[in-house]
Design a protein with these regions (language model features):
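Flavin-dependent oxidoreductase catalytic cores
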Residues: 1-100, 104, 108-120, 200, ...
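Short, Asp-centered acidic motifs that coordinate Mg2+ and/or phosphate
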Residues: 29, 181, 307
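Active-site/binding-pocket entry motifs
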Residues: 63, 70, 81-84, 188-190, ...
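Rossmann-like dinucleotide/flavin-binding elements
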Residues: 22, 94-122, 129, 164-178, ...
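A short helix-to-beta-strand connector/capping loop
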Residues: 26, 72, 156-163, 199-202, ...
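Rossmann-like dinucleotide-binding cores of NAD(P)H-dependent redox enzymes
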Residues: 122-159, 233-281, 338-342
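Short, hinge-like loop/turn segments at secondary-structure boundaries
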Residues: 25, 48-50, 138-142, 201, ...
């Protein structure tokens, strides 16, 4: 016990846990920092027992801390409206809006359009909503993303969005909905480069590994050292697989925010993951790859693995824009469907701008 009030702060996202700490006498107050940016209504939702509506901070560090340190206005992947709340006004003309894609960008756009007074239908071809967030919630330390998916779904439904899962957005279906505006939020798909052996080697994607659809065996080679590749390696080493990785760029984890990258790199070192950089893969095999060192020009190989996992990035999945462009006065493409690779902050930021433009 100390004779002064004690305030705890640091990655608190669950009000029930904060309340427990106070009741146990471990602190007098709990401070919510980034969580208050992600969802300023946290105290009210907690008081009213509406925890399912609570949008958690997912610790992405994409728009808050970096912007603050650079002297720029902060934003938030979970709440891009922060600082722009006054812009979210009722629409002057109520429209019929069709949103295609149920990832974070699509759901956020659908909800905001509904809140502005539009009639909104959200079409998602898969049985579940979430998009890339579903996969992103599997790596170690990323479980809070599943809470973000839950809150996006709950808040969409409360706003009155007509959600249709397991429904492919064909031109015929979209036309039958008579849209005044269409938002295409179909995201991205794993990149497959025209490298010899790739189509015949039986490689799995990082997404298949993270979601349990692929059996990798004990020894695994991950091709691609960006964030997805690194998180796939963490996922596998946590399950006692022996994993190595190969990356074309000179740096592993180049697209990871510095605050998170240092922990990931320490984890790779802890599990003795071999990291070959400056390596351009020139041939795929079932048990590994041949590559060329882009610095020395020498050829080398990494072979003898039980499986090879692809994490070479993403490309936009936008096959619908051309097919739908004449079905509504406004057709807006957002997120990774517009430009890949991207991130969650860009997806929800695009969603906000699209909703305000309709």
């Amino acid at each position: 016990m100390v004779p002064v009030p004690v305030i705890l702060v640091g990655r608190f996202t669950e009000p029930q846990y904060a309340e427990l700490l106070v009741k146990q006498g471990r602190a007098d107050l709990i401070a919510f920092g980034r969580q208050s940016i992600a969802d300023p209504e946290l105290p009210n939702k907690a008081r009213n027992g509406q925890l399912e509506k609570l949008t958690p901070c997912i610790a992405c560090l994409l728009g808050c801390v970096p912007n603050m340190l650079q002297g720029r206005p902060i934003t938030c992947a979970m709440n891009p409206c922060v600082g722009r709340e006054a812009e979210l006004k009722p629409a002057e003309v109520k429209k019929n809006v069709v949103v295609i894609g149920g990832g974070p960008g699509g759901m956020y756009a659908a909800r905001l359009c509904a809140l502005r007074g539009h009639s909104v239908t959200l079409l998602e071809k898969d049985a579940e909503l979430g998009g890339h967030f579903l996969v992103a919630s599997y790596p170690p330390g990323k479980g809070e993303i599943s809470g973000a998916i839950r809150s996006f779904i709950v808040n969409c439904r409360e706003a009155g969005v007509d959600i249709r899962t397991g429904t492919e957005a064909t031109p015929e279906l979209v036309a039958s909905l008579k849209p005044d505006a269409i938002i295409i939020a179909t995201g991205s798909v794993p990149l497959r480069l025209p490298i010899p052996g790739l189509d015949s080697c039986g490689c799995s994607t990082a997404e298949d590994v993270l979601t349990g659809k692929a059996d990798t065996g004990k020894r695994v080679l991950v091709v691609g050292g960006g964030m997805v590749g690194c998180e796939c390696v963490e996922f596998l080493t946590e399950r006692e697989h022996i994993v190595d990785m190969v990356e074309m760029k000179p740096v592993i984890g180049e697209d990871i925010v510095p605050e998170a990258r240092k922990y990931i790199m320490a984890n790779l070192e802890k599990h003795k993951v071999t990291q070959r950089v400056n390596a351009r893969v020139k041939q795929f095999y079932a048990d590994g790859v041949d590559f060329t060192d882009t610095v020395t020009g020498e050829d080398a190989a990494m072979r003898g693995y039980d499986s090879v996992v692809l994490a070479m990035g993403y490309r936009s999945n936008n096959t619908l824009e051309e097919q739908l462009k004449d079905l509504a006065p406004q057709v807006i493409v957002i997120g990774e469907a517009r430009q890949a690779p991207g991130n969650s902050m860009e997806a929800t930021g695009d969603a906000l701008n699209a909703a305000l433009a309709i």
